[in-house]
């Protein structure tokens, strides 16, 4: 004969209530930390661009750039109109590169009418300092342009050294604007 013992005893109900309340409390507490997700993919997101930022650039900002399709590399190069692209002077041009196959964007320091390595000079605290930039990979170029960006934010006057000639770099107002807008557009594309 089956026993008539109650299955849900008061002690069991207390235990169920405690574990139920604790689990709900844990869910609520962990929901506050939901915004941070670990990136376990092993993928480097340094140069990653989102579709929204790419479309913003293409629809609103790309009109200020000269576009060059590089179908062999699957990339599109953008050079700002303010750099005076038709000029024959020695200078540096910031090239914004969109690689839509990898959803990545790069910023390249392109020498015009000079060769690598690029040598720059500037004055800081009354002393002339030199920068030497070598042609390298995308990480090297990002490091170089961020170093240049920091100097330009400090409003340091840069000079390009070519065979002991000191050529003012980005001295015209249109070139300064081109550098500024290229930096702004690039860092908006990669959202860094």
Model regions: which residues?
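A generic "folded-domain core" signal
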Residues: 2-143, 147, 161-192
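Short, aromatic- and glycine-rich surface loops/edge beta-strands on solvent-exposed regions
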Residues: 152-163
């Amino acid at each position: 004969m089956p026993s008539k013992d109650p299955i849900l005893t008061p002690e069991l109900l207390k235990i169920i209530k405690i574990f139920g309340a604790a689990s709900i409390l844990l869910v609520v507490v962990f929901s506050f930390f939901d915004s941070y997700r670990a990136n376990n993919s092993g993928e480097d997101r340094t140069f990653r661009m989102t579709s929204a930022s790419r479309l913003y650039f293409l629809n609103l900002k790309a009109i200020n750039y000269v576009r060059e399709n590089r179908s062999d590399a699957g990339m599109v190069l953008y050079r700002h109109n303010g750099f005076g692209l038709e000029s024959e002077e020695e200078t540096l041009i910031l090239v914004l590169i969109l690689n839509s196959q990898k959803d990545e964007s790069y910023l390249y320091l392109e020498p015009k009418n000079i060769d690598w390595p690029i040598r720059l000079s500037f004055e800081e605290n009354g002393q002339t300092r030199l920068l030497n930039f070598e042609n390298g990979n995308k990480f090297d170029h990002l490091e170089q342009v961020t170093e240049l960006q920091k100097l330009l934010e400090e409003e340091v006057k840069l000079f390009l050294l070519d065979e002991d000639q000191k050529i003012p770099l980005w001295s015209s107002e249109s070139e300064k604007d081109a550098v500024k807008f290229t930096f702004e557009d690039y860092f908006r594309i990669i959202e860094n």
